[in-house]
Amino acid sequence: MMLNATEFLTPNAINVDTVNETIAKVTLEPLERGFGHTLGNALRRILLSSLPGAAVIEAEIDGVDHEYSTLEGLQEDVLDLLLNLKGLAITLHDQNEVFLTLDKQGPGTITAADITLPHNVDIINPELVLGTLSDRGHLKMRLRVVMGRGYEPANQRREDGDTKAIGRLKLDASFSPVLRVAYQVENARVEQRTDLDRLIIELETNGTIDPEEAIRKAATILQQQISIFVDLEAEEAPEPVKEKEEVDPVLLRPVDDLELTVRSANCLKAENIYYIGDLVQRSETELLKTPNLGKKSLTEIKDVLASKDLELGMRLDNWPPADLRVDDRFSYRSR
């Protein structure tokens, strides 16, 4: 197998070694040098933090007001009972929240199998020990189970009026169905190349998801998150909106509005001066060079402009305005 310097090897062999229902070892090879750690670390983080799962987030126990209470007939402290509830491996089918009940009379051991389940809820580890009751012991409690991702401390959970009620004990929730993930990178060889990686991922779940399915879901999440880069296109910067510069309305009026003498008006039109804005930009020297326009006409023009707070030789940076089309001038000229 010959590859040029710019081509990448892609894995062509994947082996899944299932130890039991909850533990599996997945081997992927060959990978380019360094890609074993790149993919291994990314998949490990996703497996531990991003797969959805169900967990108990709240418990109500008859006769118990807070987690530091003791319950007569229960050998364990309430804190120990709550800690044991975190070990429940629960599967919810087609729902995001459910309430479960447990009503147990002593003596005897309390296990997850004592929890009453609706038809759409399964407990994968019914043998889990929750506590022990003496002869006169009686435990009755109600559990709130929800779907989530990652780890959610109880003190960061949003509360409403009901969840703040006395007797509702909040639990830190670990929703991840993956209990443990470890990966290692070994050397791999393909023909003459010995600088390749072999990625080995070993993981353990709580039984609510198959280890192979967990890997598949983690890879799908990773693919979805980075797929946006495949079609990455730089957004075109929007063109700045040019603010329309205000022009003195007087400058947009035709020179005829100045009511000059016929002689002066005709001289200006001969020099293609149609608007007052055209006129004020001319200097006295320029106007005196106009045929048939003498000092008397110049004085007349200066006096009329002065009456409108204007003068000759003005500098107008925004003249002519964009909306003053060339054809406007020609139409004016033909009048």
Curated annotation (Swiss-Prot):
Entry-linked SUPFAM superfamilies: C-terminal domain of RNA polymerase alpha subunit (SSF47789), Insert subdomain of RNA polymerase alpha subunit (SSF56553), RBP11-like subunits of RNA polymerase (SSF55257)
Region: Alpha C-terminal domain (alpha-CTD), residue numbers: 247-335
RNA-binding recorded as keyword: no
Record GO cellular component, one term: DNA-directed RNA polymerase complex
Catalysed reactions listed for this entry: RNA(n) + a ribonucleoside 5'-triphosphate = RNA(n+1) + diphosphate
Enzyme Commission number(s) of this protein: 2.7.7.6
Region (Alpha N-terminal domain (alpha-NTD)): 1-233
MF-aspect GO terms: DNA binding; DNA-directed RNA polymerase activity; protein dimerization activity
HAMAP family hit by this protein: RNApol_bact_RpoA
NCBIfam families for the chain: PRK05182.1-2, PRK05182.2-5, rpoA
Family the entry assigns: Belongs to the RNA polymerase alpha chain family.
Domain notes: The N-terminal domain is essential for RNAP assembly and basal transcription, whereas the C-terminal domain is involved in interaction with transcriptional regulators and with upstream promoter elements.
Protein's recorded name: DNA-directed RNA polymerase subunit alpha
Species, as recorded: Psychrobacter arcticus (strain DSM 17307 / VKM B-2377 / 273-4)
